């Protein structure tokens, strides 16, 4: 016998046993089978009631006027309050900096949308965030001003002269503590 025939025979035997159990059921089997049917009927009626109580879906029209990423129905009240506070802060900052045109347009709206943020360049975003004296392009002179670490192989250089420790801007108390800890090492 192949595997398919064996499975088929086993299914048939199982179904026959189940039929015999149903035919020759004891009173307690009948009772519990009846209780299970009643539970299933209640569950199906509750599901039907839930399907009928399902709220009507919103139209697609609102998605053209609201940004669904920023909107959360559970925190709509909090968002409204936050938008008012942010709008006031933004207007105060704009009064200080009148040269930002895109930022002015955003401040006049009730809600800030992702589309508005994407349309702003870095200077406008920095003005909107309230950052001052920021540049939008990195100059080539900045990498040269980085501090290059000094690799010291000991207290003496190759010529045998003692190398002085690099000067730091630490207070004297911290320097003494640092010297003490270096001595322990």
Curated annotation (Swiss-Prot):
GO cellular component: a single term: cytoplasm
Key words of the record: Acetylation
Residue numbers of N-acetylmethionine PTMs: 1
Ranges annotated as biased composition (Basic and acidic residues): 1-18, 26-47, 59-71
Region annotated Disordered, chain positions: 1-71, 155-185
Note in the entry: Present with 1100 molecules/cell in log phase SD medium.
Name of the molecule in the record: Uncharacterized protein YER034W
Ion transport as UniProt keyword: no
InterPro entries associated with the record: DUF5364 (IPR035303)
Biased composition (Acidic residues): 170-185
Listed Pfam families: DUF5364
